Amino acid sequence: MLNNVMNNALSGVNAAQGGLSVISNNLANAGVGYYHRQSAVFGENPGTMTPNGYFGNGTYFSHVRREFDEFVNAQYSQSRARSGDYEAYVKNCNKVDDLLTNDIEDLSGSIGSFFTALDSASSDASDKTLIDVFLGQSNALVSQFKEADRQLQEMERDINRQIENKVKDINIYAEKIAGLNQQIARVRSVSGSEPNDLLDVRDRLVNEVNSVIGVKVIEQNGNYNVTFANGLPLVTGEKANRLEAMPSSKDDSRFSIGFVGANDQVREIPDEAFKGGELSGVLRSRQEVLDPAYQKINKLALVFATKFNEIHQKGFDSNGETGKDFFAIGKGSVVSNTFNTGKTDFDLSYSDVSQVTGKNYEMRFDGGKWNVTRLPDGVEVKVDTSTPGSLKFEGIELKITTNNPNQGDTFVVKPMNGVINNMQTLVTDSAQFAKAGSKDAGPGDNENIKELVKLQDQKLIDGGSTFSDFYATLVNDVGSRTKQAQIDSETQNKMTESFYRQEQEISGVNMNEESIQMQKSSNSLMPMLRY
């Protein structure tokens, strides 16, 4: 009987020591954000039948249970993906918004100063000084356009860099998760126990990769299989697949994301396939904010310069010569898909700038017919092919200079690409300024200047906007979208914090509770030590 008492006490001591070890580990890791609280699980030893009855044989330390709720953790992880998307989106929206409102002088104000100087020249067309001031203001306006264009192009390059960096991060996470799958499987096979510390690290990595790229996780035979973009495998068991930042086959100036498959074959993934995570936010900000801003500022420059040139050409300069183009302006481009098998070249021009939308287009050759869709909405556009060797649509004319397309060849038409880049004031001498309305007019003839001044108030863009109104609408659109994105981001972050609190209620360490448990274990240990 005495032996039984001592054995029972010893089993209790061993179990209590195990419990205290678990509690102390919880307390030590209380400040580790991804740590999951552990609980000691005890069992009752089988009893012994004796003539005097059935006697118990104490307790035993069974195992360490990791407090983990798969559903709550999945909610938190998915919420982090949405937060990551908004965070990256807002960051890039803010850059465009700052450019349009703070970083450079307001383009609308510069256009106003341009017409103010022009109106002053109209007050005394014979005053060379007033015309020189106007020409200086013209150069300042062109510089203003160019600076806005330069910064927007730099943002485009920065988007490419962001994509590269995100892809590098994703590949590192994938390798680490696959490595942990391998380590966890090895520990389980050798010891039969759960490597809770490794499980914690693996869940942390899944949460972190979800912040960068929205993923789905399926646990299979103890491994985490991680997929993204509608089912592409990022991690399968102990194997990690790779992504690659690559020039888009549609437009090699822009990066897309490729999936590296068997034999290192890279398959380009459509941008819209990415849902959640910072990478998705970067891609969305490019399509929804940066591209439209670039296109609209270049459209403003195109219509402004073209309409000014049209009126200037109707006047006469101080030498009685017909006015020439006042502004030089660039023209768009047509980009061939890298997978095209034929050879087709185009020369882009503008048949009617008032009809130009500013959007990009995708052209596809289907046998004997060219099909054109507007980007990014995919709306089919009617093409005028009445002129041989020419395609006309929405104010654009494409003359086919090399005509050897194959079935399925595609092209991206970028009507606004490079417009501002090649913009400059061509009239540098006041004597070349076509101020007069007639050839034989005197030095004070300002009739054509007055016609030029009228352009300021004419609704020449989209059939209903002045130059200043169009720019103000652009600024307002970007500002509104940025503000809404900030609100959405803040709301989503609060949801993520709420899910984290729910997760911590289950898996987090409560110092008070652990201290109470330690006291209880210590109290139960002391009587048994007396034996």
Language-model-detected regions and their locations in the chain:
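S/T-rich, low-complexity, solvent-exposed segments of bacterial secretion/appendage proteins
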Residues: M1-Y531
